[in-house]
Swiss-Prot record:
Subcellular location: Cytoplasm
Catalytic reaction annotation: Exonucleolytic cleavage in either 5'- to 3'- or 3'- to 5'-direction to yield nucleoside 5'-phosphates
Gene: xseB
GO cellular component: cytosol; exodeoxyribonuclease VII complex
HAMAP family associated with the record: Exonuc_7_S (MF_00337)
E.C. number(s) listed in UniProt: 3.1.11.6
Keywords assigned: Cytoplasm, Exonuclease, Hydrolase, Nuclease
Family recorded in the similarity comment: Belongs to the XseB family.
InterPro entries, alphabetized: Exonuc_VII_S, Exonuc_VII_ssu_sf
MF terms in GO: exodeoxyribonuclease VII activity
Keyword Transferase among record annotations: no
Pfam families: Exonuc_VII_S
Protein name in the entry: Exodeoxyribonuclease 7 small subunit
Biological role: Bidirectionally degrades single-stranded DNA into large acid-insoluble oligonucleotides, which are then degraded further into small acid-soluble oligonucleotides.
Organism: Clostridium botulinum (strain Langeland / NCTC 10281 / Type F)
Length: 71
């Protein structure tokens, strides 16, 4: 059975939780390192989602201009 794809908002919320836990300074160095690694992975996933969305918007905008010009 496949794993359900996590939403952008859920990933962003997890990242914010990680940042908050690291900012308050109440976690160990080892936990900070694990959190940092998880945060970097989440950042990369979030960046990919944003780049994909940007690409889709660009395609839609280009198509809109072509449709307008051919009218």
């Amino acid at each position: 059975m496949g794993r359900k794809k996590e939403s952008f908002e859920n990933m962003l919320e997890k990242l914010e939780t990680i940042v908050d836990s690291m900012d308050n300074g109440e976690i160990t160095l080892e936990d900070s390192m694990k959190s940092y690694e998880e945060g970097i992975k989440l950042c990369n996933k979030l960046y990919k989602v944003l780049k994909d969305a940007e690409g889709k918007i660009k395609i839609l905008e280009d198509n809109k201009e072509e449709d307008f010009e051919s009218s």
